[in-house]
Amino acid sequence: MNFETVIGLEVHVELSTNSKIFSPASTKFGGDPNTNTNVIDWSLPGVLPVMNKGVIDSGIKAALALNMDIHKSMHFDRKNYFYPDNPKAYQISQFDEPIGYNGSIEIELEDGHKATIRIERAHLEEDAGKNTHGTDGYSYVDLNRQGVPLIEIVSEADMRTPEEAYAYLTALKEAILYTGISDVKMEEGSMRCDANVSLRPYGQEAFGVKTEVKNMNSFSNVKKALDFEVDRQAKILRAGGEIRQETRRFNDKTGETILMRVKEGASDYRYFPEPDVPRFEISEEWVEQMRESLPMTAKARRAHYINDLALSDYDARQLTATKEVSDFFDQAIKFDTDPKLVSNWLQGEVAQYLNSEKKELHEIGLTPENLTEMIRLISDGTISSKIAKKVFIELAKNGGSAEEFVKKAGLVQISDPAVLLPIIHDVFAKNEQSVADYRGGKQNAAKALVGQLMKATKGQANPTVAQKLLYQELDNF
């Protein structure tokens, strides 16, 4: 029997606010254990949560980016469960009145196939702390993450293949990234994904029994985990077995999903309205204010790059792969520089440097202004493309002005025939055999002489001018 795969995803996105959702403690990542905490995070008796308005702002922006309706009146709920990293023994979340509902997002597969995935809801909640199990036999709790604001985005079970799930995550990450509310870095935990997977015979409307899969810390691992889980369930069903409703975790070393626990239902959490956080009324003016503050989407930017700047679809997609690069590009072309040249540098030397140094654009000295200044120096013949690579490394490491560095380092390209001719004659004198070979009909000998000329000028000779002069002198030598 053949089965249809049914997949729904629950994605937690960490919001980039300076303070936590209900406490003034910092959300900064990477501090020593339990240093970014407050009495509210510790749940000391008598302390009360105070709502961070910026979290609701972010929630509205996310809902708008995902084409969702917004609950104009909403409240928070208590989700009750006990775990060491949850000192209150409950999590403040949203149950029946999420901030956003009835949304959708368009996905595109590698083969060009497009589909629309419905989004059931997006709700705000606080993150839990983190447990660490030491080699000394003790377990430790770090509450730095406790209270960090999250938005959980729950899709409908509209995906039918792991490839569609991968495409959905890609589209979702892009949509959230361009709102500016999160950096959505899965490898750093600011985007986390759980998957609900079930199979059903083709033609059957009712869903099969689902399993939840956790611990997928990269896009590729999501696909691997789903591939394994679909295959596992299919083998059980074909053998006449039954699927249990359970939670499983993905082991990225073995590529398998492993049983964690029997799956809980909503009733197990005993949701009820949070009495310490008041109901919020979201006005239409508030929503419109957030809508106006949203930057141009990646999709709109791609259309602008292709239709208005004459860039290729490939270039447009590469430039919008991250918002930081797209923002940098947009700033750079304001300096009246050829968009294609800026695009080439960002995709070429800049991308290679960032990859090799394991850094992001904001962490190096390159700016839209000094990059475009360097490109102009190439265009007007002040420096060669080869010299430009040296200039770029200097700008990336130390910042500053491209023009000032070129002058200070003596890198200005030599284009004056009066300067080049004596050097050419000296090259001829030192390479008489190559000159004789050229005059004897060996055209490649001239290339060797050009190479010697560039070496003699330390790469500063204008290649076009130098080559033209050299050939003229060879013919008259």
UniProtKB/Swiss-Prot annotation:
Record EC number: 6.3.5.-
Pfam families (alphabetical): GatB_N, GatB_Yqey
ATP-binding keyword on record: yes
SUPFAM superfamilies: GatB/YqeY motif, Glutamine synthetase/guanido kinase
Gene Ontology terms, MF aspect: asparaginyl-tRNA synthase (glutamine-hydrolyzing) activity; ATP binding; glutaminyl-tRNA synthase (glutamine-hydrolyzing) activity
PROSITE patterns: GATB
Biological processes annotated in GO: glutaminyl-tRNAGln biosynthesis via transamidation; translation
Keyword Protein biosynthesis attached: yes
Keywords: ATP-binding, Ligase, Nucleotide-binding, Protein biosynthesis
Alphabetical list of InterPro entries matching this protein: Asn/Gln-tRNA_amidoTrfase_suB/E, Asn/Gln-tRNA_Trfase_suB/E_cat, Asn/Gln_amidotransferase, Asn/Gln_tRNA_amidoTrase-B-like, GatB, GatB_C_1, GatB_Yqey_C_2, Gln-tRNA_amidoTrfase_suB_CS
Transmembrane segments: none
The protein's enzyme class: ligase
Subunit structure: Heterotrimer of A, B and C subunits.
Family: Belongs to the GatB/GatE family. GatB subfamily.
HAMAP family, per the entry: GatB
Protein name, entry field: Aspartyl/glutamyl-tRNA(Asn/Gln) amidotransferase subunit B
Gene symbol of the encoding locus: gatB
